[in-house]
Amino acid sequence: MKRKALNNPLVTEDVRVRFAPSPTGYLHLGGGRTALFNWLFARKHGGVFILRIEDTDMQRSSEEMVQGILDGMHWLGLDPDEGPFFQSSFGEQHRAAAHKLVKEGKAYYDFTPKEASDDRTIKERVIDRARAQVGSAREQNPYRHLAFTEAIRRVEAGEPAAIRLKVPAEGASRFDDLVYGTQERDYSDIEDLVLIRSDGHPLYNLSVVVDDIEMRITHVIRGQDHLTNTHKQVLIYEALGAPVPRFAHLPLIMAPGREKLSKRKHGEVVSVTTYRDRGFVPDALVNFLALLGWSPGTDQEIMSRAELVEMFSLEAVNKSSAIFNFSEKDPRDWTDPKALWMNAEYQRAMALTELVELVAEQLKRFNLWREEYASSEREWLARTVDLLRARYRTTQDFATMGRPYFSDDFEYDPDAIKKNLKDERLKDLLPELADRLALVEDFTHDATESALRAYSEEQGVKAGLLINAARTALTGQAVGPGMFDIVVTLGRPRTVERLKRAAALVP
C-alpha cells in the first residue's frame, strides 16, 4: 500500500514504529501509553505499527503474560499492522551480527572466566565487570587486542568466550532526541558492552538493534528509562553500518509520591486489564493515557480517537514526568479521579445500545444477568441503564452500586438507615404506603407520586419524610435518581415487597 506524503520535517521516510514489551507481566499503563504513542504516530503519518515481543528472558517470560499483552492491546484498539514477532525467534541473526563485528575488528572475544561465587549479588558483580571495561581500564583487558587468529583457535578449541563491542577510545555518542533534544555521552563513560554471553546467549542491546534494523524501524518511541541504553545502541548501529533511527523518549509516569509507577509496588491499578474488568470504556482510557505526558496545546480534554491522531505530535510531548493521581485509601477513587471523570463523560455520550452491551458484560460477571434481559425485558434494561448512566462512572458501577435494580439481594447503607429510617412512625407508615401503592391502577411516575402525596396528607406527615424513607427502602441508599423513577423502574411487586420489608429496619 502506498503511504501518504509526509509534511513533518522530522519525518522524511515511510514511518515504521514498534512496541516491544517484555512478557514478564501484564500490560501496564506505562506500556499501554508507549503502545498508544507509537500507534498514534504511525496513524498520523500513514506508517506501520509493529508489535515485537522481547521474550529472550526465558525464566521470566510466559505464554500467559504474552496473551495478557495481546488481550490488553486488543481491548485498547491498538492491534498491530505487523506481528506479533518474537525476539527469541531471531537468535541466529543476533549471533551472526556479533560474529560479523568480530571479523571486522569492531568486537572481540573475551575469555575472562566468570567470577567464583561470593557474597556479592549478581547485580554487584555485573557492575564491577562493567567498571572494569570503562575508559582507560578497557585497554587493560588483554583480550581486547588479542590476535583474531588466536581468538578463533581458542573458540574452536571449545573455550567459553563472551563477545564484547570495542568502544572507540576517543569521542562521544550523540543523538538528537525528539523530546529531550541533543543527548551526548563520552565514550570514556561507556564500557565495552557484552553482545553475546559466554553461553552463546545474545544480550538485549544487540538483539534490539538487530531486530530494529531487520524490521526497518524508522522511529524508536519508548520510555525515558531507556536513554542510557540508547547511547550503547547507537554504537551498535554505527558498528553494523546501519542507519540510526530517530529516537523519542517519553517522560516517566509517576505515582502521587513522585516515585516511578510500578506494577510490582502499586498492583492492579497499574494493569490495563483492571480497567477493562472494572468497566472502563476503551476509548476513555486511550484518551486518558494520551494526556499523560502529551498535550494538544488547547484546553480540550475529551478527544475522539480520530482527533487524537490529527492532533498528536512528538514535539508536544512534555519533558517532565506525568503524575498518575490514584488513591489507595478511597475505594471509590481507586484510580486517578480524572480517569474516572473522563470515563463517565464517555458513558454519558455513547449510544445507549452500546452502553447496554457493556453493562450486560458486567451484569454477567456479577451473576446478575437474566436471559430475559436479552429478550422480553430488553427494553426495561435499556430504560434502567439510561436512568442510571448520569450517576455512575464505570459500567461496573451498574452491577455494584446499581445492584438493587437487578437483584432483591442487596445491602442497606447504615448511614442511609440512620438518616432516612430513624422516625419510628415509619414502622407503620411504610407498610401502609405499600398497600396504597399496590392499589394504584396506572403504575406511572405521576400516578404513584399523587398516591404518596395524598397518603402523606392524610397521615399529617411531610411528603419528604416518605419519599426519603421509600428511596432507602427500595435501594438501600440515601441518594439516587428521582424516587418515582425508581418506583416505576422496580415495578409494583418489588416496590410493595421492599417497602414492607424495610419496616423491620425502623428502630
Go through each PLM region and give its residues.
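A generic structural signal for well-ordered alpha-helical surface patches
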Residues: 67, 231, 306, 431, ...
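N-terminal Rossmann-like or analogous alpha/beta NTP/dinucleotide-binding catalytic cores
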Residues: 2-132, 229-242, 284
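Residue-level signal for inorganic ion chemistry
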Residues: 38, 69, 101, 105, ...
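C-terminal accessory/binding modules appended to enzymatic or scaffolding proteins
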Residues: 356, 418-474, 479
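Glycine- and acidic
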Residues: 17-24, 51-55, 214-220, 270, ...
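Glycine-rich phosphate/pyrophosphate-binding loops
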Residues: 43-57, 206-221, 243-254, 483-484, ...
